[in-house]
Amino acid sequence: MNVKNPPFSVVRGSAAARIALSFVHARDRIDLVAAEILAIEARAEQTFFCDDTGAYHTFQLPHVQLEFAPHIGARIHRLTSQILDEELALLVDGEVIVRPVVREPIGWRGHMSLSANDMDEAEQLAGRLRRCWVNPVLRVV
């Protein structure tokens, strides 16, 4: 082994310690590592497409937008398709941060949004979710 230039690896502890975000319901649990979360963004407005008119409408609706790797979006969609009108717990660091009621299947397009009462609440929720993107610890192996 070359002592002057030792190899490095990124280590964040056990498998459980590497979980960034979890979706938990009695039917299933989906654990995500940080690399499977592509974006977390607090937004003030949300745009919807109206099937009846074919038009897009934008409303002042504070929320947090989450974007996932495609395979994760598919798993979330399968789960939420089965649990309509039921709670789905979202955990960060093993702590439940929100328990939204699933009103429609989510995740099919690889993203979802979590409603907030105002932008301050959206920013706080986004901040808690971003905690999963901590700087890794480097260790000589």
Q: Language-model features: where?
A:
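Structural signature of multi-pass, alpha-helical inner-membrane proteins
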Residues: 1-141
